[in-house]
Amino acid sequence: RVSIRKFQDKPVEPEKIEKLLRAAMAAPSAGNQQPWEFYVVTDKEKILELSKATPYSGCAAGAPVVIVPVYRKEGLPVQDMAQIDMSIAQENIWLETDALGLGGVWIGIAPLKDRMALVHDILKLPENVEVFSLFALGYPAESRKQQDRFDKSRIHFVE
């Protein structure tokens, strides 16, 4: 999988969006707490607002879809693990995006409180959830090759 930051002006089919969210919700989570909810943004004006949420989110402006994963702030058996759980769910979305012939880019929001609050306000989210990230996606308008990042020097065996 690679980060895709340029998208075709073509909508993503609802069936494909559902497959992405099914992949996310298939993720394991600490204590099986499944802390996630997902906001699927297709409104161009809202996407434009979200694209200004961070210094690195400008690429979202051209995406037909932005998925905003959020997690519950309270009532989780292992609250401290919620962001790790969200990372696993987010990666599942990314892998499924690639499998469906789509492209996407993960835009970090949490744990930076100012970014979390800004996205929360833009989408008028309920008070009981925290914003985890933005995931801009669509049909790729660019082609990028996966780089081989394998580095044996980073592997250490303890025998």
Predicted regions and their residues:
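Acidic, surface-exposed loops and disordered segments
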Residues: 1-159
